[in-house]
């Protein structure tokens, strides 16, 4: 039981630090008045997700083409 206390305490401590940093940054954004809209957030994440999905799809297609043609 004693061996689990230190890592668990460390995880809780790091989680609290990251949470407080997020809250500080959120508060700074609200003070500036330059708040990012929900559409901008989704647009940035959507573009990243599309890029990753496109690369993964191309990789899967190239592997399938290789296996079907027997050139692997």
Curated annotation (Swiss-Prot):
InterPro entries: Frog_antimicrobial_propeptide (IPR004275). Pfam families: FSAP_sig_propep. It is found in: Secreted. Residues 1-22 form the signal peptide. GO terms for biological process: defense response to fungus; defense response to Gram-negative bacterium; defense response to Gram-positive bacterium; hemolysis in another organism. One of its GO terms (cellular component) is extracellular region. Residues 23-40 form a propeptide. Keywords: Amphibian defense peptide, Antibiotic, Antimicrobial, Cleavage on pair of basic residues, Cytolysis, Disulfide bond, Fungicide, Hemolysis, Secreted, Signal. The keyword Secreted applies. The keyword Secreted applies. Expressed by the skin glands. Belongs to the frog skin active peptide (FSAP) family. Brevinin subfamily. This is Brevinin-2SN3. It comes from Sylvirana spinulosa.
């Amino acid at each position: 039981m004693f061996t689990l206390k230190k890592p668990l305490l460390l995880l809780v401590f790091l989680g609290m630090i990251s949470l407080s940093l997020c809250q500080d940054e959120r508060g700074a954004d609200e003070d500036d008045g330059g708040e990012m809209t929900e559409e901008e957030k989704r647009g940035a994440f959507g573009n990243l997700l599309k890029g990753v999905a496109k690369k993964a799809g191309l990789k899967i297609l190239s592997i399938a083409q290789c296996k079907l043609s027997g050139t692997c």
